[in-house]
Each structure stands twice: as structure tokens, then as C-alpha cells.
Amino acid sequence: MSETDMRLVVVGAAGRMGQTLIRIVHETPGVRLHAAIERSGSPFLGRDAGELAGVGQMGVAVSDKPLEAFVEAEGVLDFTAPSATVEFADLAAQARIVHVVGTTGCSADDEARIRAAARHARVIKSGNMSLGVNLLGVLTEKAARALPAQGWDIEILEMHHRHKVDAPSGTALLLGEAAARGRGIKLADHSVRVRDGHTGARVEGAIGFATLRGGSVIGEHSVVIAGEGEMVTLSHSATDRSIFARGAVSAAIWGRSQKPGFYSMLDVLGLD
């Protein structure tokens, strides 16, 4: 541990992603766990964060005081829920630190509050923090641009574990936005998220979504571009949720040297 290590806070520390983030921070050179935050009343308050995450004692007790933690830290890693994330965004702005947001399912109002916080914080937000998925987004945009809507239909399929609460996934929407950029259209005006009963023929230029939930699947995503007599499929499989945590820590380190603003993983990876 060095005095120059970036001091990071993990919020939602007792959750699956929270524990994974703690483990990755513990093993990554150049960063250290400054604080671990849980909601008030959590049975995990006071527990050592390292023991909770299975890496042994780290000397950091789980707390329910985020602002106290933020003002002494340099960054926060946030894979919580939209209602919590907008509150953490406000606190990160007050503390003027890096806020890495992997939370999905945010509403338009939530997004507006997070973007407003970026006037003072360095916000890095993505529906997926992995290198592979962000590269998939770039490839999807290029394919959508090369293959015209007249004759080529885009469908995005995703599957996650039974506990995921939002649909389509943030990654599916990230891929949908990439496809829409490639086509020069707005996703909101062309997405089809529900098909049931007599739907009629497919509308040219639509971007369809199909969602599956079950088991312990970490994340499966495919972009299908179907033409007459041929089909292009671009896909990504996540087999270990640590890929998201590693991406988040890399994003925090990158954000440390940036000016306040709103960034994505494409900025972090130099793919934008």
C-alpha cells in the first residue's frame, strides 16, 4: 500500500457486485479501499469489508455514512439501484470526486440528475464496464451503418440471472444505442421491446429487443442483423462478474486525471 494509491469507496458493499468490487480493489495495484458503504439498518454494518468479501481483514468497517467517506476519498464505485445512485451522484458532486456508475435501469430523470452532478464530479457511466462489450458496441455501430435498414433487420437478445430486476439490460440498451447511431436514428423512436399476439409485419428500421431471465447467467448478449438469405450475429458472453469490477476500477483510475464531466467507457478505452 502506498500513499499515492487512489482511495476508493465501494457502495452497496454487501451485494454480489459490491463484494466483487472489494476483491478487485484489494488485488489491484495503485488503488486501495477507503470505505465500504451499506444502507442504514443493514445487518452488515460494522463488519470488516475484506472479511465480507472473502479476502481477509482489510481494516475497513462497513458504514452507513457515505458523505463522510466521500469527502476523504478520490472515487466511488457504484453498482447499486437508480434511487441510490442519484443520491450518491449528488454526494460525489459535493466531494468533487470520481463517480463510476454501473447502475442500470435509470429513468430519464435519474440520468438528468447524474449528468447535473457531472458539473462538479467526474462521472463515468456505462451500461457495461467490460472491454469486450464496449468493443461489441463499436462493432455494432459499424455494422448497422454498413448494412442499411432496407433489407437488414436488427434484433438484440439478452439473458441474465433470475435475480436481475430491470429489462432490457443496460448492456442491451447500450448496444441498441450503438445500432441507432449507426443508422442515424433515435433509439427511443424505433425500439420494439414487447411483441405479443397479432403484431403484424415487422416495421422496417425497427430495433427489436428480446429478454430472457433464468438461472445464474451473468450476461449473454447478441446483436442479430438479419437480411435476405444471410444473417450476421455479434455476441458477447460474460462468465465472471469480475470483468465488470476490473473495468470499473480501471475507469476510476482513468477518471482521476480528468476534468469534471460526464464520460463513458468508450472514453476510458479510447474507443469513442
Swiss-Prot record:
Lineage: Bacteria, Pseudomonadati, Pseudomonadota, Alphaproteobacteria, Hyphomicrobiales
EC assignment: 1.17.1.8
PANTHER family the UniProt entry points to: 4-HYDROXY-TETRAHYDRODIPICOLINATE REDUCTASE 1, CHLOROPLASTIC-RELATED, DIHYDRODIPICOLINATE REDUCTASE
Pfam families, sorted: DapB_C (PF05173), DapB_N (PF01113)
Residue positions of the active site: 160, 164
Keyword vocabulary terms for this entry: Amino-acid biosynthesis, Cytoplasm, Diaminopimelate biosynthesis, Lysine biosynthesis, NAD, NADP, Oxidoreductase
Biological processes, Gene Ontology terms: diaminopimelate biosynthetic process; lysine biosynthetic process via diaminopimelate
Name of the coding gene: dapB
Assigned protein family: Belongs to the DapB family.
Residues reported in the UniProt entry to bind NADP(+): 39
Class of enzymatic activity (EC top level): oxidoreductase
Alphabetical list of InterPro entries matching this protein: DapB_C, DapB_N, DapB_N_CS, DHDPR_bac, NAD(P)-bd_dom_sf
Role noted for this protein: Catalyzes the conversion of 4-hydroxy-tetrahydrodipicolinate (HTPA) to tetrahydrodipicolinate.
Residue numbers binding (S)-2,3,4,5-tetrahydrodipicolinate: 161, 170-171
Cellular component GO terms held in the UniProt record: cytosol
Organism: Sinorhizobium medicae (strain WSM419) (Ensifer medicae)
Reactions accelerated catalytically: (S)-2,3,4,5-tetrahydrodipicolinate + NAD(+) + H2O = (2S,4S)-4-hydroxy-2,3,4,5-tetrahydrodipicolinate + NADH + H(+); (S)-2,3,4,5-tetrahydrodipicolinate + NADP(+) + H2O = (2S,4S)-4-hydroxy-2,3,4,5-tetrahydrodipicolinate + NADPH + H(+)
Subcellular locations according to the entry: Cytoplasm
Pathway listed: Amino-acid biosynthesis; L-lysine biosynthesis via DAP pathway; (S)-tetrahydrodipicolinate from L-aspartate: step 4/4
Keyword presence, Membrane: no
Molecular function terms from GO: 4-hydroxy-tetrahydrodipicolinate reductase; NAD binding; NADP binding; oxidoreductase activity, acting on CH or CH2 groups, NAD or NADP as acceptor
Main subcellular localisation: cytoplasm
Record-listed NAD(+) binding positions: 12-17, 38, 102-104, 126-129
The name this protein goes by in its record: 4-hydroxy-tetrahydrodipicolinate reductase
Keyword Repressor: no
HAMAP family reported for this sequence: DapB (MF_00102)
